[in-house]
């Protein structure tokens, strides 16, 4: 599909929701509805030296811009590809002596781009950036104070001699970024490393049980011929069969929250009341709060309070890097929850998630696999069957089972995850390619295991001993 092609989607009046996009033809699960390069994007301050400012891949030994000494790139190819975006920024950073925060940098990039292209980067862009909603009038007092501080910082950063902007104009851009900024992940999808503005994507309305998902395609800058290079872009992909004329939707928040909590988050950040079917009917809230049959109300209340308190302690210990204490706290919390909270209860799932992650890090794979299995079973009952977060969780659980020597279970999970991520990410994404390699490897090992179990264990032990898992 050509980047920016909007033949599969069209703008329409979505009633109370305002504008929206609808399918102009029947779409299949995994089909790319449209792709869109960023109007502007920046790397987060905390990753400025660890992530390429062009393709947003995270890696070691990046090359630093010799002029501003702030921007970092994979190589000269990425630096050249990003020069149009970085040129004005580079001069501004040199002028004030340091780079401002990510929101100020993104606002400046947006305005530089507007000056260059009057807010429309291409013919396929359905709306100009300055027409996007800013919701500045809806911001609470604390957010307005922060906005004012950002505007003042911006005025000091904006180059002298350029077109002057009023505080209201700049506030409008900051408001647009706050409401419409899309978080960008690294090439493994494991870490949020930046934020960008994608005007056409901003037209896709929210649904807690959406029919589409968005992923970042980091592009290809490694081909020998520059004619084969492709730019960084988002892809809107169908999660299921979508008939012609049906509204396209994505989820702005993680579904793994009670409907009231999702509605609160959406109201606070995006300033609208969610009335989707899952919120209106409180769908799956019963599972997210499920208790073991026969549990008394006062016991449930006690365990719920205990779990919330322990989750705070667990997070504190994790931030401090005291992972053995994290495991101890998780074990105590799960023991308290046993026979009271069901495995689909959100509080239990959060403890299971941390426990499996930390135990895997500590290479206690058998115990980690047990927790991961329970976590995945709970997730499967709650998430959309093609949810990307579900796919990633099953993938990690599969790898954990493989490390634990549970080859058959690990292979089965990896195959399940592969099926989901083929829909959400497509066959060419780095995550899917890695998963395909794992799937092939575990399939081969499973075959070897069934043919010669003793020989397999001997070979595997030697391999793991020579290549310890980090």
For each of these PLM feature ranges, what is it?
Residues 1-470:
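Short alpha-helical interaction motifs and adjacent low-complexity tails used for partner binding
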